[in-house]
């Protein structure tokens, strides 16, 4: 069974834990209890493949930012979460993405942009803004509501699909490099 290491990142209070707990335990947590770091595991079937999701729910608070490099190193894919009623959390996505790319030493890291709390009427981040940002990053965008379950499972499953695509691409690139190296070998 394939295991996928997913990391949920974003500013404090955007609903990272609520989304994760909704996926794992099928219930909505409405009280805010800042996370330091929680780990969850769940076996699911995605596109006919049984897999194990190893989900790291991270701290959004700035005082825990020193821990970020460590969990970014181990993650295979990242849900970058902002709240649709919090413009600052949307602006912070850029910093999380840059840090992930720096730590992974790669421009190509599986990510999904997630606009959470779409059940709330007090939207300050327009859907089009988020779609444009995701398009500029070359990643999918999904609006979610941990409260109503809208899009939550889809966000995690889409991230797994992004990781699969990334692994496929990397293995194809690896095979191309191996083939190329065979043709360049000259013995004198």
Curated annotation (Swiss-Prot):
Pfam families on file: Ras
EC number: 3.6.5.2
Assembly information from the UniProt record: Interacts with PHLPP. Interacts (active GTP-bound form preferentially) with RGS14. Interacts (when farnesylated) with PDE6D; this promotes dissociation from the cell membrane. Interacts with SOS1. Interacts (when farnesylated) with GPR31. Interacts with RAP1GDS1. Interacts (active GTP-bound form) with both SHOC2 and PP1c (all isoforms) to form a tertiary complex; SHOC2 and PP1c preferably bind M-Ras/MRAS, but they also bind K-Ras/KRAS, N-Ras/NRAS and H-Ras/HRAS. Interacts (GTP-bound form) with MAPKAP1/SIN1; inhibiting K-Ras/KRAS activity.
Covalent lipid adducts (S-farnesyl cysteine), residues: 185
Activity modulation: Alternates between an inactive form bound to GDP and an active form bound to GTP. Activated by a guanine nucleotide-exchange factor (GEF) and inactivated by a GTPase-activating protein (GAP). Interaction with SOS1 promotes exchange of bound GDP to GTP.
Name of the protein in its database record: GTPase KRas
Reported modifications of this chain: Acetylation at Lys-104 prevents interaction with guanine nucleotide exchange factors (GEFs).
UniProt keyword annotation of Ribonucleoprotein present: no
Binding of GTP, residues: 10-18, 29-35, 59-60, 116-119
């Amino acid at each position: 069974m394939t295991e996928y290491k997913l990391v949920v990142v974003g500013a404090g209070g955007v609903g990272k834990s609520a989304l994760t707990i909704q996926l794992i335990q099928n219930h909505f947590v409405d009280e805010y209890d800042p996370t330091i770091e929680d780990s969850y595991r769940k076996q699911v079937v995605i596109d006919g493949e049984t897999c194990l999701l190893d989900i790291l729910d991270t701290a959004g608070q700035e005082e825990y930012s020193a821990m970020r490099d460590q969990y970014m190193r181990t993650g295979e894919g990242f849900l970058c979460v902002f709240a649709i009623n919090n413009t600052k959390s949307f602006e912070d996505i850029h910093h999380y993405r840059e840090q992930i790319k720096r730590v992974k030493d790669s421009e190509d890291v599986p990510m999904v942009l997630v606009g959470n709390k779409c059940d709330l009427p007090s939207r300050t981040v327009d859907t089009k803004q988020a779609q444009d940002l995701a398009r500029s990053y070359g990643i999918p965008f999904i609006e979610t509501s941990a409260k109503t379950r809208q899009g939550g499972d889809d966000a995690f499953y889409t991230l797994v699909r992004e990781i699969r695509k990334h692994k496929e691409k990397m293995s194809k690139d690896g095979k191309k490099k191996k083939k190329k190296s065979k043709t360049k070998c000259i013995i004198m």
